[in-house]
């Protein structure tokens, strides 16, 4: 899901470009793990205090994406866009909404976007629940 995304500094998508800059606090703290790109995604929490999981950790902090680090990509946390894709939102749904073209002020900031995504029911899960209710509706409500 995340492989085709540009790195934040190369993206013009505000939901990919802006992300939490919270520093690594040590493996004993919440949100200090690097996600596994080819495995089940992490729970996206609404209340993370900036400690959203890492997309990539440095070698010093136990990072496993050595090829990316050797290319000069740096340690960083997941972006709102990456969190939204993990939660099954459509790739064009906007979460970070700039107030102006200079991207200095925001209607919805990256921090606000993380909260929206973390509080949401994943769209594909909601769809399957709705379909199940629709299929059973006539059984329980005649």
Please provide the spans of the model-predicted regions.
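A conserved active-site cap/scaffold subdomain adjacent to cofactor or substrate pockets
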Residues: 1-4
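C-terminal target-recognition/interaction regions appended to catalytic cores
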Residues: 7-142
């Amino acid at each position: 899901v995340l492989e085709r995304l540009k790195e934040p500094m190369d993206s013009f998508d505000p939901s990919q470009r802006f992300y939490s800059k919270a520093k690594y606090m040590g493996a004993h703290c919440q949100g200090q793990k690097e996600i596994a790109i080819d495995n089940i995604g992490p729970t996206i929490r609404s209340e993370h205090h900036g400690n959203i999981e890492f997309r990539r950790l440095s070698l010093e902090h136990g990072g496993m994406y050595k090829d990316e680090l050797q290319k000069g990509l740096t340690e960083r946390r997941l972006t709102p866009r990456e969190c939204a894709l993990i939660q099954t939102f459509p790739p064009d749904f906007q979460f970070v909404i700039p107030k102006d073209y200079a991207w200095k002020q925001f209607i919805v900031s990256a921090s606000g976007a993380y909260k929206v995504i973390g509080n949401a029911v994943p769209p594909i899960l909601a769809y399957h629940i709705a379909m199940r209710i629709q299929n059973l509706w006539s059984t329980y409500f005649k």
